[in-house]
């Protein structure tokens, strides 16, 4: 029997959700509105990587389905020490993809607004380019600067 090689690939991402609550006394997990889970094709209890854009922290937990139409993204249990209301987070789920399919694999990428409402579905834009505020189909160059006045996009 020949083992099929696999690669761990991004399967789904919810980009820049706004955290609405944090409860250290809850047993654990990350509450996500069911509408976002369905849009991203993430299942309840699926493993999630949580990257806190605001604080720079990262953790792994699992998704728990919130109430319909609630827009609540809540850090529960120990995660509440690393994530606070108002933080922006990226939620990512991974899958093992057969090597033969890796080159054509396309993850499900969804982007949300500050109220955790779906704004659009993929594709992802590679840095140093950014989406235009007026039109998701147009790109602009990043104008962020380092403390010494150099463009942040250098070296991307």
Curated annotation (Swiss-Prot):
PANTHER family: ASPARTATE 1-DECARBOXYLASE. One of its GO terms (cellular component) is cytosol. Pathway: Cofactor biosynthesis; (R)-pantothenate biosynthesis; beta-alanine from L-aspartate: step 1/1. It comes from the Bacteria. This is Aspartate 1-decarboxylase. Binds 1 pyruvoyl group covalently per subunit. It catalyses: L-aspartate + H(+) = beta-alanine + CO2. The gene is panD. GO terms for molecular function: aspartate 1-decarboxylase activity. It is an enzyme of class 4 (lyase). InterPro entries: Asp_de-COase-like_dom_sf, Asp_decarbox. It comes from Rhodopirellula baltica (strain DSM 10527 / NCIMB 13988 / SH1). It is found in: Cytoplasm. Keywords: Autocatalytic cleavage, Cytoplasm, Decarboxylase, Lyase, Pantothenate biosynthesis, Pyruvate, Schiff base, Zymogen. Catalyzes the pyruvoyl-dependent decarboxylation of aspartate to produce beta-alanine. Is synthesized initially as an inactive proenzyme, which is activated by self-cleavage at a specific serine bond to produce a beta-subunit with a hydroxyl group at its C-terminus and an alpha-subunit with a pyruvoyl group at its N-terminus. The keyword Cytoplasm applies. Substrate binds at residues 61, 77-79. Belongs to the PanD family. The modification Pyruvic acid (Ser) is found at residue 29.
């Amino acid at each position: 029997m020949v083992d099929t090689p696999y690669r761990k690939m991004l399967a789904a991402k919810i980009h820049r959700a706004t955290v609405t609550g944090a409860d250290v006394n809850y047993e654990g997990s990350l509450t996500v509105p069911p509408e976002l889970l369905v849009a991203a094709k993430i299942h309840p209890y699926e493993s999630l990587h949580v990257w806190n854009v605001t604080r720079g922290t990262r953790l792994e937990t699992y998704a728990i389905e919130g109430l319909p139409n609630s827009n609540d993204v809540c850090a529960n249990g120990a995660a509440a020490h690393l994530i606070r209301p108002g933080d922006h987070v990226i939620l990512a789920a991974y899958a093992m993809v057969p090597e033969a399919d890796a080159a054509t694999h396309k993850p499900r990428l969804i982007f949300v607004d500050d109220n955790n409402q779906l704004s659009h579905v993929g594709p992802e834009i590679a840095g140093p380019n950014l989406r235009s505020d007026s039109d998701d189909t147009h790109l602009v160059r990043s104008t962020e600067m380092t403390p010494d006045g150099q463009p942040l996009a250098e070296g991307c």
